[in-house]
UniProtKB/Swiss-Prot annotation:
Binding annotation for Zn(2+): C35, C230, H255, E259
Keyword field contains ATP-binding: yes
EC numbers on record: 6.1.1.16
Listed name of the protein: Cysteine--tRNA ligase
Lineage: Bacteria, Pseudomonadati, Bacteroidota, Flavobacteriia, Flavobacteriales
The family this protein is said to belong to: Belongs to the class-I aminoacyl-tRNA synthetase family.
List of residues binding ATP: K290
Cofactor binding, per record: Binds 1 zinc ion per subunit.
Amino acid sequence: MALYQEQSLKLYNSMSGEKETFTPINEGNVGMYVCGPTVYSNVHLGNCRTFMSFDLVFRYLKHLGYKVRYVRNITDAGHLENDADSGEDRIAKKARLEQIEPMEVVQKYTVDFHNILNKFNNYPPSIEPTATGHIVEQIEIIKTILDNGFAYEANGSVYFDVVKFNKEHSYGKLSGRAIEDMIANTRELSAQSDKRSPQDFALWKKAEPQHIMRWPSPWSDGFPGWHLECTVMSTKYLGEEFDIHGGGMDLKFPHHECEIAQGEAATGKSPVNYWLHANMLTLNGKKMAKSTGNFILPEQIFTGNNEVLTKAFSPNVVRFFVLQAHYRSILDFSSDALLGSEKGFNRLMDAYRSIEELPASDKSDFNLSEWKQSCYDAMNDDFNSPILIAKLFDAVKTINGIKDGSIQITDTDKEEFKATMSAFMFDILGLIDAASENKNEGDKLAGTIELLIKLRADARNNKDFALSDQIRDRLQEIGIQLKDGKEGTSFSVK
């Protein structure tokens, strides 16, 4: 029996505003789509929090035994400034300012994005499609929406008709906005606008002469609207109806609202069963955002090169800090908060490493199964990582109790205890036992040096003193000191 058949997972569905029991469309299989980055600059920590949150979701679903297809896109075209239907493409603007090709911008910041998430120990998605790789599919879905009567062409651009759509469906149901209120609170369209209503949004935009990112279409040489790519890529790889759609809270409106409208207009079906939204990271009490300059880059945290930091912090500690808050809660970033997380992280790791040396008894008075289920209960409650971490610190108290003899545990329970700690700390939370990794690296280094010492000894025995001295000198250059003695050669690392 798979774990998912034993555990009852509940998700907070943004559509209903309630926690709901998770039941995938196809038993044992999960389709999950998460909106990825627009790759025109380095990702900041606020962006990374969202992706760490959905990495936790991905990891736990896999742990439960689900076969998960996780799709996360790369936006490499069509995202205009201020998330609007007019203005300059963000990537094209960056290319113009740096005097390079747009795809050079895309390549540079996609590589940076992957490198940063790798440092945070995020699993890669199953599929990572790009907007520019799906232009044909985006044109085809626009044709379908036009044929179904929910869009119109104007001067080479195509717009989604929100008012007409709302007569048969419900635009605004995810964000809880009534279209009447939206109309009342929106300025009138300018005389130059091709839209019928201010709420309408672009499915295809005719490119201005200076717009260098353009593709041919039945309507004009132009580019797809930002909202369209996610509808196309999610449904292409997950089907017209799929299980989970995730993203930052700031994408709920208009991006996700528009995705729902496009999907329903094209297929008549609501595309997503569970909508999950991760909350923001704040700095100085305000939302972390590039547009306001109120952000911090991960590399600045790793090096300590930012005025808000008192020292550098490892990716491991930053991940632990992020997961100490529930993904739907606002999290405020500060150096003091990271210092607290670092202490907690080290305490947890030290306790885990000591399990192997715990004294075993003939009987256990530690209720292992109850504690283990409490860890699952935390994750089953909408991926409640802070409660899970609290349960792991309960385990630290138990470990200390076993050390001082106030709690007993058998060898069998000790093995299961360690395996359970490992599963929740490393497989699910995605933490890394850096000391163990460093020890493994240290063992590899020691083995390599011992081999060089042997080669040096062979050279000396063969009276090849030039090679012997070269090995000694090169090791010394990289901080490894050899010391010859009666018992042989030893080494120390400076």
